[in-house]
Every structure is written in C-alpha cells, then in structure tokens.
C-alpha cells in the first residue's frame, strides 16, 4: 500500500473511520451517467438541437454524432471512474434503422436494443427519460396542452417509454428509474395557471394507469422553477411535483439547478426522505440559473453528498448526474463531474456523522463547529487515490492525460 494512504488510514482511524470499509462501500454506490453530455443533448431522432428552455453553450471539437461515437465516448468515461454506474438515456436517443423508424408516440423496445447490448457489456442498468422537447409537437405545451391531439400524443409517448423502461429492467436485471420532466410553461404572465396544471395531472394519471411492475420501474417526477422562454410560469412547479408524487405514490426527483438560487437541495433531502420511501437526485451545478455547468467539488455538492450519507438512507436514493458543457472537452467534462461527485460521497463517508450528531444533540455546538472545520484538512485525497488504484483507474490528474490522448487520436477525426 502507498505510504500516504497508510498514514491517512491511521489518521481517520483516530476518529473512528475505517477507510477500508468506506472504500468497499463507495465502490458499490451506482451513479447514473447521463448520455446527453456527449452530444450536447441533440439525440438521434431529429436534426435539430435541444429546445424547451434547454441550452448548451460552446462548440468544442469532437461532439459525438452517431450512436457508435457516443458509446465509444461513454466507454472512455467509464474507464476513468471506479465504482458502479448506470446509463441514463433520453428517448430521443432511439437508434433507428431504415425499416423501423417511428415517432415518439410509437417508440418500441427494439429501438433501444443497441443500448441494452451496450449496458450488458458493461454490467450496467439503464435509467430512462421520456423526451418532451425537441419535437414539432413540443411548441410550448406538451402534457398540459389544451390541444387534445397534442396532449394525447405526449401521453402515448409517456406510456411507450414506460414499457421501454420495463424492458430495460427485464433485460439488465436492474431496476430502471423513469423520470418525467416537461418544459411546459409561458414566457409572460398567463391568464390561467390552474388549467395547464390540471391537464398535466390528468396526463400523468393516464400514463400511470398503464400496468407496470413497480419493483422494476420507479417513476419519478422532476419539477423546475423556470427555463429560457418560460420565465413567468412553469406548469411543473415544485409544489405541483411534490403534491403529485406524494399523492400518487411515485418518487420525487430533485435537480439542484431547478430551484431558486437561494434554495439548497441539500436542505430538502431530509424532509423528502421523511415522506417518501425513495428519492431521486440529479446532481448538477447551477450558476445563477439552471445552467447545467459541470459538477465541481464545491460546497453544495459536498453538502448534498453529506445529507445522502448522513441520512442512513443511501440505498433509497437514486443518484444521477445532469449537466452538459460544450465549451470544454466533453469527455473531460463528463469525467470531472463524475469523479467530483464520487469524491464528495467519499468525503461524506469519511466524516464521523454519528459523532457530529451526538454533539448537536448534546448542545455542544462549539465543539461541533470546530471539528466540522478541522476535518476538512484530513487526508481524504490519499484515500481517494488509493481507491482509484484499487479500482484500476488513474489517480490524481493522470486521467486527463488519457483524455488528451483520446482527443488527439479519436475526437480530432470527427466533423
């Protein structure tokens, strides 16, 4: 073992932390990797880019343009992070042949068979997202549309995706999280706020009326405060989302970029866990709005991880990443965010949370404050480097050398 790790192991032992146990447990935590970082949320079922209040900025060379390129890029990222992973797909990443093209309301499992083969190759489960944007029938309102033809089209899309999600679970043997997020809303002050939300509720009820195995598919609902072009009103608000999931017995999903900048998802996790058996998270980094910057090892990322671990409910929480940055190398963006979130989980697991809780309950807030600050200087980095070595992935910044080589040999050849 590395001497730095031996010293770190001894240091953490003084506060009752077994680093060997922590590394074993960290390797067993699945993090769902979002496919859309690799191609700027473009997908394969249309020629246009993302809409619905979603915006990818930058034009760094090397964007994946085909399923084969995207899969190759994901494989590179997987090789640079140790631990369990899942693959997070949007419905817009269906892979068609000339013979089986379909619109979104008639998508079938066969359109995702190549992704299943890819996931099986890497021992991963698949999470899924109906895509209610970047489509001719997604012009402002989808599941909340007053146009019955439009609304029913998107209901059929949701039902088709539910069947595909169950297919993923059956094929991989790992439960699938199917997340619903819609971009519905208005740029300016609406005349009627309750009508669209009532229609959204009706649409969700119709999707949920489809029989499915609740041990294999977990349906989640994601809210949002606003998006570009939807500044004044968002149908799927936080209050709607919370009320709906708790009344229907599905799973709340919180994206830490989908709230007002002064709201912290880290403070919401404990409350949601008291009222819901399961919880799903999209970890991102919001800069003044839902900008989906690459996840850094910043205060909120660390606090989210701390709340996940300290809750004692980590097995009840579905963890996923959600960001997209085209201003830097996309493989580096993917990898950095993934490794940063795993570092945050490691730091949380190396924290004597039980001791800190005891001090809080004793009213010894001075010692609690001091220890919370002092532990920030503990050598968690040496533990992370040892974890990487044991997982067979590069420690430290050496992973970026592999990304540079991949760019020079693979990405540079893309148009």
How would you label these PLM feature ranges?
Residues 175-189:
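Aromatic- and glycine-enriched pocket-lining scaffold segments that form the walls
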Residues 183-185, 224, 323:
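Short linear capping/connector segments at secondary-structure termini
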Residues 110-119, 123, 145-161, 197-213, ...:
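Acidic, His- and aromatic-enriched active-site or binding-groove loops in soluble protein domains
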Residues 189-300:
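Acidic/histidine-rich catalytic cores of soluble enzymes
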């Amino acid at each position: 073992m590395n001497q730095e790790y031996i010293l770190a192991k001894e240091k953490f032992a003084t506060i009752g932390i077994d680093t060997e146990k922590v590394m074993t447990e960290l390797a067993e935590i699945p993090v769902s990797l979002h496919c859309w970082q690799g191609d700027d949320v473009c997908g394969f079922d249309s020629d246009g880019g993302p809409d619905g209040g979603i915006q990818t900025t930058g034009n760094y060379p090397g964007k994946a343009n085909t399923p084969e390129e995207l899969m190759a890029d994901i494989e590179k990222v997987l090789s640079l992070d140790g631990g369990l992973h899942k693959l997070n797909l949007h419905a817009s990443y269906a892979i068609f042949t000339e013979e089986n093209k379909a619109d979104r309301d008639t998508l079938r499992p066969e359109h995702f068979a190549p992704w299943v083969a890819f996931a099986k190759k890497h021992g991963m489960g698949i999470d899924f997202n109906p895509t209610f944007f970047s489509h001719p029938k997604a012009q402002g309102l989808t599941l909340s549309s007053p146009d019955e033809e439009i609304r029913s089209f998107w209901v059929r899309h949701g039902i088709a995706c539910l069947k595909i999600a169950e297919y993923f679970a059956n094929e991989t043997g790992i439960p699938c999280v199917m997340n619903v997020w819609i971009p519905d809303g208005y740029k300016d002050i609406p005349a009627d706020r309750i009508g669209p939300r009532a229609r959204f509720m009706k649409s969700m009820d119709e999707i949920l009326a489809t029989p499915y195995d609740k041990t294999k598919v977990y349906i989640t609902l994601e809210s949002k405060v606003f998006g570009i072009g939807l500044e004044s009103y968002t149908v799927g608000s936080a209050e709607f989302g919370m009320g709906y999931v708790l009344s229907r017995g599905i799973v709340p999903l919180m994206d830490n970029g989908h709230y007002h900048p002064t709201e912290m998802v880290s403070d919401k996790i404990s409350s949601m866990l008291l009222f819901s058996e399961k919880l799903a998270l999209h970890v991102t980094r919001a800069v003044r709005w839902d900008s989906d910057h690459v996840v850094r090892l910043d205060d909120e990322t660390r606090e989210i991880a701390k709340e996940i671990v300290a809750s004692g409910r980590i097995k009840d929480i579905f963890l996923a990443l959600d960001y997209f940055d085209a201003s830097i190398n996309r493989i580096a963006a993917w990898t950095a965010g993934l490794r940063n979130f795993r570092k945050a989980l490691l730091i949380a697991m190396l924290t004597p949370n039980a001791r800190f809780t005891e001090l809080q309950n004793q009213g010894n807030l001075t010692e609690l404050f001091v220890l919370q600050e002092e532990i920030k200087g503990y050598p968690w980095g040496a533990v992370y480097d040892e974890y990487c070595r044991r997982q067979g992935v590069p420690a430290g910044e050496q992973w970026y050398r592999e990304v540079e080589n991949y760019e020079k040999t693979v990405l540079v050849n893309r148009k």
